From Swiss-Prot:
One of its GO terms (cellular component) is plasma membrane. It catalyses: GTP + H2O = GDP + phosphate + H(+). The keyword Nuclease does not apply. It is found in: Cell inner membrane. This is Elongation factor 4. InterPro entries: EF-4, EFG_III/V, EFG_V-like, EFTu-like_2, G_TR_CS, LepA_C_sf, LepA_CTD, LepA_IV. GO terms for biological process: positive regulation of translation. It is a peripheral membrane protein. Its EC number is 3.6.5.n1. GO terms for molecular function: GTP binding; GTPase activity; guanosine tetraphosphate binding; ribosome binding; translation elongation factor activity.
Length: 599
């Protein structure tokens, strides 16, 4: 056990994490040169394309160090984006140390910071590495100081390397072996294995990535999942050298994969503990929590006959993604679809893109909403994830909205713009620290505002320099109202939105104006109204198309003209009673952009 090293790499997007892992795999001979390709560990096309890591992966490598010993390195790859922070914390819980990779040109960013603090809270040994030193813009001294200032770890002798050219990667490995402690644990004790990640394989069922904390797991053992109490047979187990290699046992301290013929990914929840059925551990490993979606949106197929295919596609995706939540929803305007819950906006985009790309579906998304906590007058607490589920105004005793704690890192020059943006988003400043010319800002901002377009606007006001990390803090009482859209007096459920009372007038007016441009003119007037309860706050009218009935009259008597106009008016009135308004697709997308253009 003393020769095992479990580590992961913490890095901001694009700081060279995947490239560094490619180099490490190459040096340790995990893959032959022929099989080597860029970003070995990012297995999804989307991961490659966006240059981000979404699912955790692991690799077991043998490294012959300069002291003559051969070490087993277990490298667990972690996602870097804020939406996947729970997956990061699971990956880190399986390690004893982490490499903090920072781009020597760009310096420390907010997400690096968030994950680094998670690692330090778990008492991991953090080893700083300065990457991309071959770039002309690299300034390793300044960045080393930045790491000491902002993160607070000693970086004077940080390893310098360039993953692209391979310079200094050997030093990274030596430092790894020297500084990161070997795993602790009792090889003779009852089995405790942490599930780092699970994914679905068409042939094997659910494959789980596990780290053995105590005891030993052998092929053919009966294992028990501690949170659900179900038992399974350990059919196959082994390690990744990125390729799957079968083994007969996994020893204490090792990281590997396990197949138990579980059909459903919820049977092996990420972060759960596995133990032996015949000799169970007394308690589960700490840190397991059910992942709760933060953002909800309705997804509807454009063609209603795609509904079945859509349902199957969601089912398949959720096999791989335990944090994706969905339930059927029907809307009078959009037909049948699903209400889906996501970890954040990036997660939502990725799921939507995967549905459209891998399953050939055309989808409409309704405006993303967050979960509100509503206390009704009968003192019962319910959680509302869509405007249509909100109880009537007179039944609500108190409505509480989720507040997110946002950590931002940005250059001083953009401080004013960013503070203005945060205040506009109803944010409350809780902390502000200067580090050289960087500022670390902490704000508490309502989740609904963060979800709408906060990230895009933050990037544009700071010219892309600001970085953001947010997490759910608490529910807080707030004066929120539901704005309904009525078209000719009929509510359109898919267009409703929940917003703060102060913004409701503006949001309502913008929405109505936007709809007016999008709804085609008909033979009769169309009234578009925004209402809070029964109180109308904005209205605009799409004018009717009318024929000039007086064209044939020439001179003519006034009473003759009046008669014709009156007749036309009655016809229009009759039309209006029976006419239906067809809403075009763009109308639903309009909601997504309310409040974006005019800023």
């Amino acid at each position: 056990m003393k020769n095992i090293r479990n580590f992961s790499i913490i890095a901001h997007i694009d700081h060279g994490k995947s490239t560094l892992s490619d180099r490490i795999i190459q040096i340790c001979g995990g893959l032959s040169d022929r099989e080597m390709e860029a970003q070995v560990l990012d297995s999804m096309d989307l991961e490659r394309e966006r240059g981000i890591t979404i699912k955790a992966q692991s690799v077991t490598l043998d490294y012959k160090a300069s002291d003559g010993e051969t070490y087993q390195l277990n490298f667990i790859d972690t996602p870097g984006h804020v939406d996947f922070s729970y997956e990061v914390s699971r990956s880190l819980a399986a390690c004893e140390g982490a490499l903090l990779v920072v781009d020597a040109g760009q310096g420390v960013e907010a997400q690096t910071l968030a994950n680094c603090y998670t690692a330090m809270e778990m008492d991991l040994e953090v080893v700083p590495v300065l990457n991309k030193i071959d770039l002309p813009a690299a300034d390793p001294e300044r960045v080393a100081e930045e790491i000491e200032d902002i993160v607070g770890i000693d970086a004077t002798d940080a390893v310098r390397c360039s993953a692209k050219t391979g310079v200094g990667v050997q030093d990274v490995l030596e430092r790894l072996v020297r500084d990161i402690p070997p795993p602790e644990g009792d090889p003779e004790g009852p089995l405790q294995a942490l599930i780092i990640d699970s994914w679905f394989d068409n042939y094997l069922g659910v494959v789980s990535l596990i780290r053995i904390k105590n005891g030993t797991l052998r092929k053919g053992d009966k294992v028990k999942v501690m949170s659900t109490g179900q038992t399974y047979n350990a059919d196959r187990l082994g390690i990744f050298t990125p390729k799957q290699v079968d083994r007969t046992e996994l020893k204490c301290g090792e990281v590997g994969w396990l197949v138990c013929a579980i059909k459903d990914i919820h049977g092996a929840p990420v972060g759960d503990t596995l133990t032996l059925a015949r000799n169970p551990a007394e308690k589960a490993l700490p840190g397991f929590k059910k992942v709760k979606p933060q953002v909800y949106a309705g997804l509807f197929p454009v063609r209603s006959d795609d509904y079945e295919a859509f349902r199957d596609a969601l089912g398949k995706l959720s096999l791989n993604d335990a944090s994706l939540f969905y339930e059927p929803e029907s809307s009078s305007a959009l037909g049948f679809g699903f209400r889906c819950g996501f970890l954040g906006l990036l997660h939502m985009e990725i799921i939507q893109e995967r549905l459209e790309r891998e399953y050939d579906l055309d989808l409409i998304t309704t405006a993303p909403t967050v979960v509100y906590e509503v206390e009704t007058t009968s003192r019962e607490v319910i959680y509302v994830d869509s405007p249509s589920k909100l109880p009537a105004v007179n039944n609500i005793y108190e409505l509480r909205e989720p507040i997110a704690e946002c950590h931002m890192l940005l250059p001083q020059a953009y401080l004013g713009n960013v503070i203005t943006l945060c205040v506009e988003k109803r944010g409350v400043q809780t902390n502000m620290v200067y580090h050289g010319n960087q500022v670390a800002l902490t704000y508490e901002i309502p989740m609904a505002e963060v979800v709408l377009d906060f990230f895009d606007r933050l990037k544009s006001t700071s010219r892309g320099y600001a970085s953001l990390d947010y997490n759910f803090k608490r529910f807080q009482a707030s004066d929120m109202v539901r704005v309904d859209v009525l078209i000719n007096g009929e509510r359109v459920d898919a267009l409703a939105l929940i917003t703060h009372r102060d913004n409701s007038q503006n949001r309502g007016r913008e929405l109505v104006e936007k709809m007016k441009d999008l709804i085609p003119r008909q033979q009769f007037d169309i009234a578009i109204q925004a209402a809070i309860g029964t109180h109308i706050i904005a209205r605009s009218t799409v004018k009717q198309l009318r024929k000039n009935v007086l064209a044939k009259c020439y001179g003519g008597d006034i009473s003759r003209k009046k008669k014709l106009l009156q007749k036309q008016k009655e016809g229009k009135k009759r039309m209006k009673q029976i006419g239906n308004v067809e809403l075009p697709q763009e109308a639903f997308l309009a909601i997504l952009h309310v409040g974006k253009d005019n800023k």
